[in-house]
UniProtKB/Swiss-Prot annotation:
Name the UniProt record assigns to this protein: Cytochrome c oxidase subunit 3
Biological-process GO terms, alphabetical: mitochondrial electron transport, cytochrome c to oxygen
E.C. number(s) listed in UniProt: 7.1.1.9
Purpose: Component of the cytochrome c oxidase, the last enzyme in the mitochondrial electron transport chain which drives oxidative phosphorylation. The respiratory chain contains 3 multisubunit complexes succinate dehydrogenase (complex II, CII), ubiquinol-cytochrome c oxidoreductase (cytochrome b-c1 complex, complex III, CIII) and cytochrome c oxidase (complex IV, CIV), that cooperate to transfer electrons derived from NADH and succinate to molecular oxygen, creating an electrochemical gradient over the inner membrane that drives transmembrane transport and the ATP synthase.
Length: 269
């Protein structure tokens, strides 16, 4: 894992991206997925195959898109310091937008929780809603996420110090922990005594935890890509933008989950 200087051989600091089909393919795949989910939820489609095919299309488009980006960075030397700075700034803006989305969902939850109406029985949680104990699976998931923060920080320090073996171990352990989190979240949904259609409590609960769970699935894929790139000698101790953005993404989701645990599971139950 020596310093990679291939990104400094260009005569200008900008990356002039060539024509790529993957943005439009990904956009149409996401539109197909959204339509399939909406039509299935409202009973217009009786089969889950359209959703399954849409997910395959999204993953296929994103995989080939990421493949091109990795080739541009690692093998073509297109990612100069200016390009890396732009990628980091763009990802920070993405993180800010994600925080604002979760802030709006917290607002919706607290708007009803702090002032429950007569329709909710003048109490929160509403009458007849069996809440999930914060001392069971939610607490276990919180411990798992905190542990993943430790292992990914271990991987980050190993990467900066040029220790490929420990970096590989750190990312592998982190990937396993995040996958366990997603699995336990699935178990929690399976045994929950309420659904998305159970009033404002069910809709806000599953919107918050479900959106976070979707991001955790995305994070699992990102960690798997980082683990593979470390194994493939793609990262160096000075050039690892993909790893840094993934690590930042994990820490942001950790903090958001702590707010979900405190507000939704502990205070809200």
């Amino acid at each position: 894992m020596t310093n990679n200087v291939r990104g400094y051989l260009q005569l200008h600091p900008f990356h002039l991206v060539g024509p790529s089909p993957w943005p439009i393919f990904t956009s149409f795949s996401l539109m197909d997925l959204a339509l399939s989910l909406g039509l299935t939820a409202h009973g217009y489609i009786a089969s889950i195959w359209p959703i399954f095919l849409a997910i395959i299309a999204v993953l296929y488009s994103m995989t080939l898109w990421f493949k091109d980006i990795i080739a541009e960075s690692t093998y073509l030397g297109d990612h100069t310091l200016a390009v890396k700075r732009g990628l980091n700034q763009g990802f920070l803006l993405f993180v800010v937008s994600e925080i604002l989305i979760f802030a709006s969902l917290f607002w919706a939850y607290l708007h009803s929780a702090l002032n429950p109406t007569m329709d909710l029985g003048m109490q929160w949680p509403p009458v007849g809603i069996p809440t999930i104990s914060p001392a069971e699976l939610p607490l276990l998931n919180t411990i798992i996420l905190l542990a993943s923060g430790v292992t990914v920080t271990y991987a980050h320090h190993a990467l900066i110090n040029g220790n490929r073996t420990n970096t590989l171990y750190g990312f592998t352990y982190t990937t396993i922990l995040i996958a366990l989190f997603v699995y336990f979240q699935y178990l929690e949904y399976s045994y929950a005594g309420f659904t998305l259609s159970d009033g404002v409590y069910g809709s806000t609960f599953f919107s918050l935890t479900g959106l976070h769970g979707l991001h955790m699935i995305m994070l699992t894929i990102m960690l798997m890509i980082c683990t593979w790139r470390v194994y493939n000698y793609d990262f160096t101790n000075t050039s690892h933008v993909g790893a840094e953005t993934t690590i930042l993404y994990l820490h942001v989701l950790d903090v958001i989950w702590l707010f979900i645990y405190i507000i939704v599971y502990w205070w809200g139950s």
